Amino acid sequence: MDLLQYTFFQHALLGSLLASIACGIIGTYIVTRRLVFISGGITHASFGGIGLGLFAGISPILSAAVFSVLSAFGVEWLSKRKDMREDSAIAVFWTLGMALGIMFSFLSPGFAPDLSAYLFGNILTITRGDLLMLGLLAIILIIFFCLFIHPIIYVAFDREFACSQGIPVAVFEYLLMMFIALTIVSCLRMVGIVLAISLLTIPQMTANLFTYSFKRIIWLSIGIGFLGCLGGLFVSYHWKVPSGASIIFVSILIYAVCKVIKR
């Protein structure tokens, strides 16, 4: 394959693998705990951090990470209050992040920034720094889930039972929300804000067609996610279409085929 000779494509392949590992692990918790809507809110809230980074002249990804983690904590805290419904808390941070992102990006000095890279992503432009961030996150998630897999499963499936077992549920919930936020930000370069949530849900939905085991869903999700990324890259190359959209298209196609097979 001639493509494999290019550094940018090698980076894209490695980024796909690392992102598939990170998304496969934390995405299984998201789908099991039914946090898809919350994750979507955090994804769009990260746009506020991107705008702030562009305005302040710092790394947009770094500021997006901080903003996303704080938004995740805010959603978690507000959703536990009796005077605030969870969907309302999500809507607050979702719209606040988007509004701040637009405002700060237009107030940024110099030429108007190109926001399409953050909204829609391009896996072919990921850098060594992005790979290091993804690799570090994947390693941390592997270690964390290996050490605390049973408490995480208890929290994911039955919060009340986890509390009765003396598990510090609130601590795990906040830590996992932080990992969700960091994983979302790490994938922005690949598929962008608009499509990032798909990497955290579609492979898990596909895996769930074949097994209900939490651990097996993780393993299958990683493989399915990587397959979707590979397919998306080649579709993008041959059809000359955006890589982020191609990855999601192939992932949904895989889900549809598996759904038909399992009928």
What are these regions (language model features)?
Residues 13-18, 61-66, 91-92, 131-136, ...:
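Hydrophobic alpha-helical transmembrane segments
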Residues 28-111, 207-219, 238-239, 262:
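Short loop segments and helix-boundary regions at transmembrane helix junctions
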Residues 15-24, 45, 49, 53, ...:
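Alpha-helical transmembrane segments in multi-pass membrane proteins
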Residues 131-202:
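Helix-loop-helix "hairpin" substructures at the membrane interface of multi-pass membrane proteins
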Residues 6-11, 82, 90-150:
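Transmembrane helix-bundle core of multi-pass membrane transporters
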Residues 190, 194-245:
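Transmembrane alpha-helical segments in multi-pass inner-membrane proteins
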Residues 1-21:
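Membrane-interfacial amphipathic/re-entrant helices at transmembrane-helix boundaries
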Residues 241-248, 252-263:
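Cytosolic-side transmembrane-helix boundaries in multi-pass membrane proteins
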